Amino acid sequence: MLPAVSAWLHHPLTRNSAFMHLWAGQTAAQVGFQVGTLATSAIAITILHASETQIGVLSALQTVAFLLVGLPAGAWVDGWHKRHVMIAADMARIGALISIPLAYGLATLTLTHLMIVSALLGLCTVFFDVAYQSYVPIIASKRYIGAANGRLEASYQVGHAGGPGLGGWLLGFVAPPLVYLLTALTYALSTWAIWRIRAPEPTPARTGAPLLAQIHEGLSFVRGQHLLFPLFSCIAAAAFAGAGVQVLLPILVLRTLDMSATQ
């Protein structure tokens, strides 16, 4: 056996069943989010014939929750059981996703319906992401938090890179609304994996402080860190620029260049 593989298999995190279940659930959710994002653009462009402005609004709805709810979500999740939040977010996403192929089969699918589902998916993703990031210190010892976050980030990058490719390949075989069934399956796998975690979770601390005070405390902490604040600023700028590309690329490929989703 290769030394690197042996070291990975015998790493304490690999033998930590709670972390491995969280990792599996987060990986499935990341892939599902990326596949669903591509399917949403394909439906809007090829089936509902949405305009560029409407596609822009649709794409914004998928990410606006991170801007509007990201900070309050962090404060709220601090006072909730993280595992319960992740399971609830996954189940809500499953219900929203299944409604798309259902409406498509009944010939009642509209752009408004798609926008509502996109906004709901974005909202649930915010709470899921905040909860799993806050859950890592609970199930992994302080010594291995860096390694745990490294594995989770690797899954995010793999999902970000491979999810659209998988979604494009699937769109070559089935109608875009039916791809949502696979996306719902990934969230079902995520729900199952996280439900299997049996690690005890401490009772959430409820400070009783007003929501705005909790948000201000978090922002003050980030601003006071010489490494965190520049990193936060770079990530925010990259996410803003990347969102613009994600809006324009499907329009360019599917409408302007008249290419298939598989291509």
Task: Please report, for each region that a protein language model flagged, where it lies by residue.
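Alpha-helical transmembrane-bundle signature of multi-pass membrane transport and export proteins
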Residues: M1-Q263
